């Protein structure tokens, strides 16, 4: 496995590669990331993973300085999974000058995560486009856990006419169904035991809708009340149409319920896809 930190040697290494699958990460890898690597291996011959903590997608009050940086450990995990190349640039490599040209996503970036993390998706879209231009993969794999991000990356590829297939990887969960996240390591022991409640309330919403309940506002409100009762500071629980992420309507078919809430100092997100029974 090659670990490359600069753009020019990466491009030299990629000469002649015509079947590339790319998995961008910020490091702090766990089984969720590794499942994306395995998906990438099923699609293309050469698998590239990037490790880069992107300052542009962090607000000044967020955890950029605290975010896990475990490059040596991450590279060992990636090598075990059969990754061919790790691209691990320094910040000055991707941003040699202040990034004045930014990718401004569609209005969907201003709702849900975008509402509570202003500028987040602008930073994500900008770095993803830069990485796509550097790596030039035929396939890129993103996880469904970051559901809104996946939607925006798909729109990015479509609207910029990028010849890249965007593959969605399923959310990987711990044995108690907590969605795996690099930020889970921030949780204290008692918080880790409580953290599964986010999945539980989303599951309850899913069951209600699949059982015929169409009082979406009531379901969202009840879910947030349950979380608040147990000490969570909830940003949103929201039922959306799956393909557009517009607020769900009673006649919609495929839906998704998304939630984001803070437990202590740790902000967690999760989502569950919903397929109502046909009447």
From Swiss-Prot:
Could you tell me which pathway this protein works in? Cofactor biosynthesis; (R)-pantothenate biosynthesis; (R)-pantothenate from (R)-pantoate and beta-alanine: step 1/1
Q: Any one Gene Ontology biological process term?
A: pantothenate biosynthetic process
- The residues the record assigns to binding beta-alanine are 57
Q: Which residues form the active site?
A: 33
InterPro entries in the record? Cyt_trans-like (IPR004821), Pantoate_ligase (IPR003721), Pantoate_ligase_C (IPR042176), Rossmann-like_a/b/a_fold (IPR014729)
Q: Which reaction is catalysed here? A: (R)-pantoate + beta-alanine + ATP = (R)-pantothenate + AMP + diphosphate + H(+)
> Could you tell me where this protein is found in the cell?
Cytoplasm
Q: What class of enzyme is it?
A: ligase
EC no.? 6.3.2.1
Q: Which GO terms describe its molecular function?
A: ATP binding; pantoate-beta-alanine ligase activity
Residues the entry annotates as binding ATP:
26-33, 143-146, 172, 180-183
Q: Name one GO cellular component term.
A: cytosol
Keyword terms of this UniProt record: ATP-binding, Cytoplasm, Ligase, Nucleotide-binding, Pantothenate biosynthesis
Which annotated residues bind (R)-pantoate? 57, 149
- Note, other: The reaction proceeds by a bi uni uni bi ping pong mechanism.
Regarding protein family, the annotation reads: Belongs to the pantothenate synthetase family.
Functional description taken from the UniProt entry: Catalyzes the condensation of pantoate with beta-alanine in an ATP-dependent reaction via a pantoyl-adenylate intermediate.
HAMAP family in alphabetical order: PanC (MF_00158)
Q: How does it assemble?
A: Homodimer.
* UniProt protein name: Pantothenate synthetase
Give the encoding gene's name: panC
């Amino acid at each position: 496995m090659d670990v490359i930190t600069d753009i020019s040697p990466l491009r030299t290494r990629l000469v002649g590669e015509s079947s590339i699958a790319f998995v961008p990460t910020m490091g702090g890898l766990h089984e969720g990331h590794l499942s994306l690597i395995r998906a990438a291996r099923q699609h293309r011959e050469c698998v590239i993973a990037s490790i880069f903590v992107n300052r542009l997608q962090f607000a000044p009050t967020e955890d950029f300085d605290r975010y896990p940086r475990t490059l040596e450990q991450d590279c060992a995990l990636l090598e075990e999974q059969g990754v061919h190349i790790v691209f691990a640039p320094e910040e000055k490599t991707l941003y040699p000058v202040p990034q004045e040209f930014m990718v401004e996503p569609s209005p969907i970036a201003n709702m849900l995560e975008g509402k509570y993390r202003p500028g987040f998706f602008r930073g994500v879209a900008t770095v993803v486009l830069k990485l796509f231009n550097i790596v030039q993969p035929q396939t890129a794999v993103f996880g469904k856990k970051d559901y809104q991000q996946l939607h925006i990356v798909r729109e990015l590829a479509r609207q910029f006419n990028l010849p890249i297939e965007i593959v969605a990887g399923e959310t990987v969960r711990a044995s108690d169904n907590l969605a795996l996240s690099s930020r889970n390591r921030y949780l204290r022991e008692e918080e880790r035991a409580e953290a599964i409640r986010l999945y539980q309330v989303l599951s309850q919403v899913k069951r209600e809708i699949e059982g015929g309940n169409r009082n979406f506002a009531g379901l969202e409100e009840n879910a947030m009340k349950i979380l608040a009762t147990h000490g969570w500071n909830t940003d949103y629980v929201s039922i959306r149409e799956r393909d557009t992420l517009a607020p769900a309507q009673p006649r919609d078919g495929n839906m998704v319920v998304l939630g984001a809430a803070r437990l202590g100092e740790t902000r967690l997100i999760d989502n569950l896809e919903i397929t109502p029974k046909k009447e």
